[in-house]
Amino acid sequence: MANTLVGRKRIRKFFGKIREVAEMPNLIEVQKASYDQFLMVDEPEGGRADEGLQSVFKSVFPISDFASTALLEFVRYTFEQPKYDVDECRQRGITFAAPLKVTLRLIVFDVDPDTGAKSVKDIKEQDVYMGDMPLMTDNGTFIVNGTERVIVSQMHRSPGVFFDHDKGKTHSSGKLLFAARIIPYRGSWLDVEFDAKDIVHVRIDRKRKLPVTSLLFALGLDGEEILSTFYNRVSYERDGADWRVPFDAERLKGFKASVDLIDADSGEVVLEAGKKLNARNARLIGEKGTKFLKATDEDLVGQYIAEDLVNAKTGEIWAEAGDEISEKLLKALDDVGVTEIPVLDIDHVNVGPYIRNTLAVDKNSAREGALFDIYRVMRPGEPPTLDTAEAMFHSLFFDAERYDLSAVGRVKMNMRLDLDAADTVRTLRREDMLAVVKALVDLRDGKGEIDDIDHLGNRRVRSVGELMENQYRLGLLRMERAIKERMSSVDIDTVMPQDLINAKPAAAAVREFFGSSQLSQFMDQTNPLSEVTHKRRLSALGPGGLTRERAGFEVRDVHPTHYGRICPIETPEGPNIGLINSLATFARVNKYGFIETPFRRVKDGVVTDEVAYLSAMEEAKYYVAQANAGMDAARKLTDDLVVCRRAGEVIVVAPDRVDLMDVSPKQLVSVAAALIPFLENDDANRALMGSNMQRQAVPLVRADAPFVGTGMEAVVARDSGAAIAARRSGIVDQVDATRIVIRATEETDPTKPGVDIYRLQKFQRSNQSTCITQKPLVRVGEPVKKGEIIADGPSTEFGELALGRNVLVAFMPWNGYNFEDSILLSERIVKDDVFTSIHIEEFEVMARDTKLGPEEITRDIPNVSEEALKNLDEAGIVYIGAEVHAGDILVGKITPKGESPMTPEEKLLRAIFGEKASDVRDTSLRVPPGVTGTIVEVRVFNRHGVDKDERAQAIEREEIERLAKDRDDEQTILDRNTYARLAEVLIGQSPIAGPKGFRKDTTLTREGISEYPRSQWWQFAVVDDRLMTEIEAMQKQYDESKKRLEQRFLDKVEKLQRGDELPPGVMKMVKVFVAVKRKIQPGDKMAGRHGNKGVVSRIVPIEDMPFLEDGTHADIVLNPLGVPSRMNVGQILETHLGWAAAGLGRKVSKAVDAYLKNQDIAPLRAEMEAIYSPSELEGLSDEALAEAGNNVRRGVPMATPVFNGAKEADIETMLEMAGLDRSAQSTLYDGRTGEPFDRKVTMGYIYMLKLHHLVDDKIHARSIGPYSLVTQQPLGGKAQFGGQRFGEMEVWALEAYGAAYTLQEMLTVKSDDVAGRTKVYEAIVRGDDTFEAGIPESFNVLVKEMRSLGLNVELTNSKQQAANDQIEPPADAAE
């Protein structure tokens, strides 16, 4: 790692022992490769392959009209340049997409009315616009309406055939009922299943069931063929009073004789009754030459006839195939002289009579009846005819338009049923159906195994490209219907393809998919890790997948085939557990959609470097050793017995039987889990929480890479796109906070500019309102290699992921402030902004055109003091950099009010004084409660044709200046490069012509040539033709580059000056971005990487915190009781190693100081060589070493990869090297008393994250606010500015205290006593503190509810009621 730019800046000590052979695939390759394969933007030489978008068009086109007189064919498609680039789309709130143009060919035929022959009459070709196709950004996301979205890959059941049983749940006897199911990619499902009576049924699309023989009849078999397909036959021949039956040892193997077996020829007993026919007996009988055995009539009774027995002369059928032989039938056959009876080989043990029994109960016996039955099931209520029934049956399984197994389905089917159909055969064949029924019957007979649904060989991944392909196909099919109708209704001779096509349905399908599909998700952009994880997510939910409610335990559980493919740790807690997973680090998806993982090949016990990617199905047949199996220097396996996996089982085998070996110990886990050091020492539940919480870490103002990492940090930072990598090698030309200009040095394509300009993002808002800001890492003049990190992004430091901060932790209780996982922090953490983060809130306001007149954005707002307008410019928009608080005006806006008719006098006054204030109201955008911050950006959007205000013009001018600066810098570098190359060619030449004043045949020198302006150098002409050609080519390239540069600049300016596309009725829109600084405070949630989460309970002055002997105070105090029960010991090991890292940092720091003082590098080199391995320091100069040393002053960063990291002994070695106690415990002193604590305390550096659950976003205060309409109680929730609910249990608490008056006002005037609360308000205003509680509104609601039930409830005054009761006469008298 030392040779990269980042490595030169900070070197990580690596503890991994196992060399990694395979390169880890790019982390977002899943998304990018899939979508590229779908779009295939650049058409290859020989045309596009039949996949992705091409296959969609091919499957829908050609389209013919109903009379077949015209045909619309698809030729090719192309993409044009997107109208706006990614950043422009983000800012304007539009979709990043490219226009799709499709070339279509319309062929019109002449049809001869007599013969029906067709001849081509006309061919027209035309490019048709088919809507915009969203493009993927370089980071694997889509920009839809200005927001970044991710399409999550879906796990679903692979197409193919599956065999299963009901686990004995259906029938009360617990009998296993077997079933087979053929699942196509699209089309009807076919189920074949047994019932409790062992009859085989078939269902199509889960409709009513039919006997399976009806399906076989419909396929064109007759009864005899069905039986001969499923059963062997045995022939019985008459031999006097008995029968002869051929002796077949193979068929009778394992058969137990109930009577003596007698040789039909010799009459000898070959097997006595009660004995079993085993291999030895069979051989002996064979040696005796037995060919036939004797059989009696009793043996024949109960057997089934194999073929129709027919009188050859009269055609009379004596017995049909499948009939059971009874004594009566046998006698009848004897009477007519039948001497040979073929029977089915059914012994009721190895071969059951299931198909024969099904045939017997099936009321159909021919194809027609079977087809009618299938038709009635599929379309109940419609009368079938043979033609419609045949057409419907054909379209169910044999029509490529309606039924598609897909290549995957065909491959899976071939593997499961031992067939060999090409994977282009996408429909079912007769042989497939027969093979499925055969395999099912074999299962019932006890042969073969059922399939495991959760095996990764039976589940596949549908990525973006495939999901999009399916969606687009739906859109095109909707379009097809419209095209057919249009073709039939217009004059086909005069129309062009354009007139037939309405691309709206296709565009709508795409828009609907990206906008509202369950798998199109708002990207989690909290930090770079959460982005990467989101793109690598696999969901079993979504259209065509499972639902939370239906998914059982098995689907969610970890399966042995997940090893190296799906992470067993990272999955959400809660209802989605196990349904949403993450791809493992080395996993990739193959062309069939199965997840593959890499292995090293092992030959004769020697491990090679050859890497093979295998899917779960392929892996099953190999013995796979772990990555940590013992090897010697020659890579030979050293153990006598090696622990291996094979087909989900763990077994021990000899080294020479091992076929494969894992590539890396971390191939088991996902990216997030691979970032947890000492993962192997944590309990799985806590590791799960750790993985999930790293994704919620907020980027902090100052990123700090962990002292104890795993080596994955740099990979995540690079692949996530948070840190910027150089696109080409070159030399840094300019650097400032907003951009880096690199002059490319590698020879590049002449059409590309020789300059790369990298714009850095500054204070951009992410989807989660965290702050995206990038800062440069390079200096002017530094050489940069392609792929090196040149700028850090959010949560990255020196090109490494840095989600949190290293803080000094003490594990000890502290006055109960860390009870129940609470966290105690030092004031230093707040003062030094250790856990301060910046959040950017976006507010927008629109000026609409209303019925009463247009709204106006202005500074002139009625009844507002000048003080309130102090932050607004003359256009009424807040300044950048202004500090705003809750209630401040951000954008002034007035809306016209409905006017009352005016008297003539008023009209006159209005005309004279132009008073306008009375007819408008203030609808300005104000800062919502709870927000305080600084304005970082303002964007103004104007509708086309609306005049721009001063602010919009100022923003536009600024932007144009920025673009002009880019153009000028690029031009300068282009000039410098080109003229330098031209000078190289000309110097030393003696031109025959040149600029004015040049003497012919003078030899040019560097001084001589510089006398002329550079633009005149092109006028030199030399004799050498080759050089002249070179100079001309150079000039042509220079002019073209210049022209391209200018054109690009003009295009961008034109886009800026063009009006914006705003929603209908909106004249102007202003977006204001406020940066809010959030310091850590009590109530914020923090966590480590091991699932050790807690809430900050108190921030203590630094002098009260526990401190070490040298006066160093702890930054954070955690409760030691949080560790043992949760079994996440990794955090303790991390603390120890972090302590050692800081100790080593101190030693290196001293050596660096010595070097800076007296320029002696030796002590520093000795120190560094003691810490790092020689390969890590290879090729470092003294300056580079000093810089590396300087960067590790605070602590030497370590990498301890998962399952392959530092062991206890390594930690102790490091502690000793740092001159610390091997126990890593220290004597601590109480900050308040100065006394030492009773025993030593574990102290060290731990990496803590601040999570996105901030108390500022959760808690708010309300005095008055909105009330619910019906109950008149305050609303709830922060968003509604609601109150805190005083619920049932809180009422009990006040009752328990006997606080009657407090309780009364809680339930009345502070809640829903409408009159009462108004009176209280008035009383408070008057300064009076007496009030009376009335009736709560919710009581009235209850009364109304009871009345609606027909129960009249009336309220009466109890005193008056008592008085009335005394006077009232008896009830009957009153009648």
UniProtKB/Swiss-Prot annotation:
Coiled coil: none annotated. Keywords: DNA-directed RNA polymerase, Nucleotidyltransferase, Transcription, Transferase. This is DNA-directed RNA polymerase subunit beta. Pfam families: RNA_pol_Rpb2_1, RNA_pol_Rpb2_2, RNA_pol_Rpb2_3, RNA_pol_Rpb2_45, RNA_pol_Rpb2_6, RNA_pol_Rpb2_7. The keyword Nucleotidyltransferase applies. The keyword Transcription applies. PANTHER family: DNA-DIRECTED RNA POLYMERASE I SUBUNIT 2. Its EC number is 2.7.7.6. GO terms for cellular component: DNA-directed RNA polymerase complex. DNA-dependent RNA polymerase catalyzes the transcription of DNA into RNA using the four ribonucleoside triphosphates as substrates. GO terms for molecular function: DNA binding; DNA-directed RNA polymerase activity; ribonucleoside binding. It catalyses: RNA(n) + a ribonucleoside 5'-triphosphate = RNA(n+1) + diphosphate. It comes from Methylorubrum populi (strain ATCC BAA-705 / NCIMB 13946 / BJ001) (Methylobacterium populi). It comes from the Bacteria. Belongs to the RNA polymerase beta chain family. One of its GO terms (biological process) is DNA-templated transcription. It is an enzyme of class 2 (transferase). The RNAP catalytic core consists of 2 alpha, 1 beta, 1 beta' and 1 omega subunit. When a sigma factor is associated with the core the holoenzyme is formed, which can initiate transcription. The gene is rpoB.
